[in-house]
């Protein structure tokens, strides 16, 4: 993919023009990328909403769960994605004037219905292997979040690198960082710090793409330590998924990876363990 003289992404990208935009960005080019989730049921429904004049909202890009990409607004024009927003480091207010908005198709915050059913605000249920239990950076209690797919995270990273090569991108931010208390996207299921590092750090000699995408591997490993706690999220700060730990020799089905932590399924329970204790 590449960006043409009309500030459109060329390649396997669908152009769907949104009427919801302002004039040119400050300096007529962006220096910031803002990541969002759609909180919608599909990429297509979110594109329709962002292209409806009634919504008074838009974004430059929407990335589907299969990695498909839609562009709605040229990159040199103001899209209406950030709303009331500010950036402490630069002192800016109204980030729409400086940024490219990228929406990823994701249901967002979910409500637990049972051990294997989590409900979105629009009524769709998701299984436990598509859910992360985690505490948001701006909150105090653990909640349930829809996971992103490997395909859309890979597409997001590729697009952000293309944007960074074409424009003087200095900042990669989450909506939750520029509108804290008002917005929670892209949420703890999105590897925001890793994206920032991989887009803004020009030294890629030791790059590991799977470290960003948290790929699904779906194979079986065994516990190689006497006792191994299984937690509700990737880290010791998360609560135990069950009180009795796994024991040496127990088999677990690997679902996905987040750094050194691995999401596993065992006896119908989905949780997270430290990967160094699996073989």
How should these model regions be labeled?
Residues 207-232, 243-247, 255-258, 277-279:
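SH3-family beta-barrel domains
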Residues 235-241:
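Short alpha-helix capping/helix-loop boundary micro-motifs
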Residues 166-182:
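Acidic/histidine-rich, metal-coordinating catalytic segments
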Residues 249, 262-266:
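SH3/SH3-like beta-barrel fold
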Residues 2-166, 170:
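Active-site-adjacent loop/helix surface patches within enzyme catalytic domains
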Residues 181-212:
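Short, low-complexity, polybasic intrinsically disordered segments
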Residues 266-279:
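Boundary regions of SH3-family modules and the immediately adjacent low-complexity/disordered segments
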